[in-house]
Amino acid sequence: DNFVILQQMVAIDRAQNRFELRASIQTLLRIIGSCTSSERVYIFDWDETDNVFRNSYEWCGDNVQPWIDNLQSVDSADMPYWLEAFERGDSMIIDNVEDVKDLMPSEYQLLVMQDIHSEIAFPIFYKDQLKGFIGVDNPHIDSSESFISLLGVVGGHLGNVRETLRMTELLEQRNNSLEKSLSDLNRERTFMSVLCTDYI
């Protein structure tokens, strides 16, 4: 199982654009879901400006209700315990949500609302900055240390790949803008040259 996840991480590395990356990440979520026999696997992006989490990716098992449309703006105030843990780089491993009812009451309400009984969640980082987290709902596995460590690696890797692609696309946009400006300038110079020739 671990090897299959690692293979998909290599595929994510090879993504050439945002569309390929999105498809590769979606496949990764499906693989994690299959390996853990879970009901749902998803990614939340952290919007530090608005202090909200936004559900950006979701994979659901058979006959499992999707929640992505309802989770586009989860206020950080509703996830204080998780946010603090993720910022420390800690993962969340919950074998039974009833055991954390008093420890994290806000998160408990969110989990119960989605019919979640057990949970694994781990942060996504880029250069020590929290970018979001990956969640695995109702997994049917033993939470082995090696597997949890692998999920942590996945979180860090996704953060790096997504940010690198974002910066690459931004650079390409700036280059295209610069090329257009130079083209417009050359066209204007040619036009002025023709005018001057006609005038003379």
Residue ranges, per PLM feature:
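Signal-transmission linkers at sensory-effector interfaces
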Residues: 1-23, 34, 170-194, 198
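Short regulatory alpha-helical segment in sensory/regulatory domains of signaling proteins that mediates
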Residues: 10-20, 28-37, 43-48, 111-112, ...
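GAF sensory/regulatory domain recognition
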Residues: 30, 42-87, 129
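PAS/Per-ARNT-Sim sensory domains
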Residues: 77-81, 99-107, 173
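Signal-transducing coupling segments at domain and membrane junctions
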Residues: 95-118
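A short, aliphatic-rich beta-strand micro-motif
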Residues: 117-125
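Amphipathic alpha-helical "output/dimerization" segments
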Residues: 126-129, 142-173
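Short glycine-/small-residue motifs
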Residues: 132-133
